[in-house]
């Protein structure tokens, strides 16, 4: 059972696209970069766990987006991005879970909670906006099952990296568009994620005994 690689062909096509004439070109590049990491992991290549191998495409895709499309991107912004994303990941690891086998695939996308880099949109994000971005990212992943087809980290995992990376950028932009005030706190969504995962049947928690894993014909 194998999935055809798509990242290289997508990147080659995008190299011939005038990004100024296509406002969604940046999203296509995010998809390509996330695909590349997901595909490398699926074929047994070397990737950096963040927070799992199956979700390792999100951070590099968003970082590459920052370096490529954000005016004034800097090494300082990258460091702050990684430090803050790591800190939020530790909050989830300490107070909930980052394990798909424990609480489903929602746990793997905790780093949708990310710091808008320092020069993103030309101003500093307030800590409340950082927390808001983290909350938005997880709130809309609640209940996400982990049901890999054939037990391989390919379907839906590779595409899910791309979807999550785009969602991470959007969560940051939504948070930056506000003043940081919001009804749902990060603590509340973290607790909800953990409780939701514990309520999931085991067939939806990385066992490949339910969901897509049993409804896709492997031939």
Where are these regions (language model features)?
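A beta-strand-loop signature enriched in Asp, Gly, Thr, and Trp
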Residues: 95-105, 129-133, 144
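Generic structural signal for well-ordered, non-membrane alpha-helical segments
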Residues: 23, 27-34, 52-55, 59, ...
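A generic structural micro-environment signature
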Residues: 9, 47, 53-56, 98, ...
């Amino acid at each position: 059972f194998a999935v055809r690689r798509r990242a290289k062909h997508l990147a080659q096509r995008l190299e011939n696209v005038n990004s100024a004439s296509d406002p969604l070109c940046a999203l296509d590049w995010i998809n390509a970069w996330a695909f590349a990491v997901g595909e490398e992991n699926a074929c047994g290549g070397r990737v950096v766990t963040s927070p799992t191998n199956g979700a390792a495409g999100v951070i590099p895709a968003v970082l590459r987006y920052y370096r490529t499309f954000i005016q004034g991107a800097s090494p300082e912004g990258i460091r702050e991005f990684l430090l803050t994303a790591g800190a939020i990941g530790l909050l989830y690891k300490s107070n909930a879970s980052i394990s798909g086998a424990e609480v489903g695939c929602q746990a793997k996308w905790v780093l949708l909670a990310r710091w808008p880099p320092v020069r993103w949109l030309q101003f500093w994000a307030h800590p409340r906006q950082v927390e808001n971005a983290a909350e938005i990212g997880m709130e809309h992943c609640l209940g996400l099952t982990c049901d890999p087809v054939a037990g391989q980290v390919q379907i839906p995992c590779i595409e899910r990296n791309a979807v999550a990376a785009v969602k991470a950028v959007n969560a940051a932009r939504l948070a930056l568009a506000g003043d940081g005030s919001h009804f749902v706190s990060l603590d509340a969504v973290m607790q909800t994620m953990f409780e939701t995962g514990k309520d999931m049947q085991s067939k939806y928690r990385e066992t490949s005994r339910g969901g897509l894993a049993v409804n896709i014909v492997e031939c």
